[in-house]
């Protein structure tokens, strides 16, 4: 993962 929340793999 590179972002804490992204549209490809949403980390809620």
Swiss-Prot record:
Leucine amide: residues carrying this PTM: 12
Superkingdom assignment: Eukaryota
One Gene Ontology term from the biological process aspect of the record: neuropeptide signaling pathway
Function noted in UniProt: Mediates visceral muscle contractile activity (myotropic activity).
UniProt similarity note: Belongs to the pyrokinin family.
UniProt subcellular location: Secreted
Name of protein: Pyrokinin-4
């Amino acid at each position: 993962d590179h972002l804490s929340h992204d549209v490809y793999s949403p980390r809620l």
